[in-house]
Amino acid sequence: MHKQVEIFESDAKEKLVVAVTMATGRQGIGVVKELNQTDKYQIRAITRNIKSTKALELGRLNNVELVKGDLMDPESLKKAFEGVDVIFGNTTPTKGWKLFRGSIVRSYEMEQGYNLINQVKTAYEKGRLNHFIFSSISKAKDPLKNDPAPGHFTSKWDIE
């Protein structure tokens, strides 16, 4: 059982608007559902396909708004981030983990990260964005070993 943690404080009576990228992915679904445990947040669940089974499941939750957005499409992110207070951003090395071999992994995730960061900056400059959370990886490599880290680890580090 999870202990409910208040991650954002607000003196305003209106709900904080929290955008969650890749909302239908494993991590995104968990974030959306956890935030939805209280009535304090309006959650903007950003996904490539708002008609997918997972998206429709999220859309049935209170306080959840489905928004079409793709980390590979900066304009869709710009629209999705308008008027948000908080952005939870995560990236993926592949589209559905099917292309998990070779350099495409790194370049795909780096492009997502570049688009995400640029649109977060735009949202901050033009709106009311106060918090940005980027889901990354830490300590995934043993510093005592000389093994190279996998590309999908180093790409997250470089996005940071």
Label each PLM-derived region with a short phrase.
Residues Q27-V31, L116, I159:
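Hydrophobic residues within alpha-helices
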Residues T21, I46, N90, F134-I137:
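SDR active-site strand-loop-helix element
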Residues K3-Y41:
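N-terminal Rossmann NAD(P)H-binding glycine-rich loop of SDR-like oxidoreductase domains
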Residues Q42-R44, E65, H131-I133:
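A structural signal for isolated positions on well-ordered beta-strands in alpha/beta enzyme cores
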Residues R48-A123, A140-L144:
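NAD(P)H-binding glycine-rich loop region in Rossmannoid oxidoreductase-like domains
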Residues P150-E160:
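Active-site Tyr-X1-5-Lys
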Residues I7, S138-G151:
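Active-site "gating" loop of Rossmann-like NAD(P)-dependent oxidoreductase/epimerase domains
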Residues V17, D85-V86, H131:
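Structural motif
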